[in-house]
């Protein structure tokens, strides 16, 4: 995200943090991809708008600024989005994307000029294809003044509806890469789309290479070990120091650093965090996520869409 924002001309990022903020400061540091990083710490959760008000003293006094959700991955052209924001004299500009089923998100209705006219709530019933909020905004400084201080405030339910009523909210239609990686399935899909955009990296051949199966596109980090008879890929992403045991199967999955997949284990369509041990003969159901340096006992059957954290 820092690289994406930096490529669009952003030179400073403010991270609104709460839980585990001290750990995040250590992990992220104060410079990422040439961009300066500052932290605004919430003592209690302040919703989606409250953190903007809290961080006001870290922002410039006159220039518009971007707000983006932390679980969005995209290639939105933020330079052009900012230009349109200024050309239309909007107070807020929201990036929108077209999805087949907007029911998990709610729809954004616009006029022929792209001005936002109405928001429709999330629905449990699948809906026709429509535009949804992409989680990336340009806001003018005047928006900060409209956010009440000292309490949790929602951009989507309190701030934006008022701007829409006053005709001060514009949309920016994005037709490129966009994923909401807050869901395991979307996180996996986003990584796989990026994987297919670049030349995949295969393991270095050794004497027993013909007894291993590595199907492209896949990515293998440094010092990965693939056991005899193991099958990796397609669409497998193995980070550094990952071990895949003899006759194990890893497909359509993301495996983080220093994780071990035991012999004859199967991992499909899942995300396995760093330093996790998957016992021999275990089966990890599609859509699952395991993290927290856990050890899964030998022969364990993990149901599809399971979330197992320490």
Language-model features: where?
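Conserved N-terminal catalytic core of the sugar/cofactor nucleotidyltransferase
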Residues: 1-69, 78-80, 287, 291, ...
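Generic beta-sheet signal
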Residues: 16, 40-42, 95-96, 119, ...
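Acidic/His-rich active-site region of diverse nucleotide-sugar glycosyltransferases
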Residues: 47-49, 105-121
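Catalytic-core segments of class I nucleotidyltransferases/pyrophosphorylases
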Residues: 64-66, 73, 79-86, 100-102, ...
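Residue-level recognition of short loop/turn positions
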Residues: 69, 112-113, 223, 229, ...
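A short, conserved acidic/glycine-rich loop-to-beta-strand motif
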Residues: 88-98
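Extended, small-residue-rich solenoid/repeat segments and analogous flexible loops
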Residues: 151, 164-252
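Glycine-rich hexapeptide-repeat left-handed beta-helix
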Residues: 246-310
């Amino acid at each position: 995200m820092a690289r994406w924002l930096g490529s669009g001309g952003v030179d400073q990022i403010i991270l609104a943090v709460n839980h585990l903020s001290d750990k995040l400061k250590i992990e992220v540091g104060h410079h990422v991809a040439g961009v300066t990083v500052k932290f605004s710490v919430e003592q209690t959760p302040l919703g989606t708008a409250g953190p903007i008000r809290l961080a006001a003293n870290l922002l410039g006094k006159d220039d518009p600024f971007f707000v983006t959700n932390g679980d969005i991955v995209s290639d939105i052209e933020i330079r052009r989005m900012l230009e349109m924001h200024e050309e239309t004299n909007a107070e807020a500009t929201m990036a929108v994307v077209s999805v087949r089923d907007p029911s998990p998100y709610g729809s954004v209705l616009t006029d022929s000029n792209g001005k936002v006219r109405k928001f429709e709530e999330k629905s449990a019933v699948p809906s026709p294809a429509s535009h949804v909020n992409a989680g990336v905004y340009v806001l003018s400084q005047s928006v900060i003044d409209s956010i009440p201080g000292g309490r949790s405030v929602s951009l989507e339910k309190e701030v934006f509806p008022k701007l829409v009523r006053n005709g001060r909210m514009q949309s920016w239609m994005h037709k490129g890469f966009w994923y909401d990686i807050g869901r395991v399935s979307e996180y996996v899909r986003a990584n796989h789309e990026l994987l297919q955009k670049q030349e995949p990296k295969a393991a270095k051949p050794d004497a027993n290479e013909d007894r291993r199966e590595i199907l492209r596109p896949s990515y293998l980090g440094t010092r990965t070990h693939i056991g005899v008879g193991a099958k990796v890929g397609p669409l497998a992403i193995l980070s550094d120091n990952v071990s895949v045991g003899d006759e194990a199967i890893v497909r359509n999955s993301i495996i983080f650093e220093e994780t071990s997949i035991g012999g004859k284990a199967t991992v499909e369509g899942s995300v396995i965090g760093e330093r996790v041990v998957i016992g021999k003969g275990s089966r990890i159901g599609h859509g699952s996520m395991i993290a927290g340096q856990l050890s899964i006992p030998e022969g364990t059957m993990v149901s599809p869409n399971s979330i197992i954290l320490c």
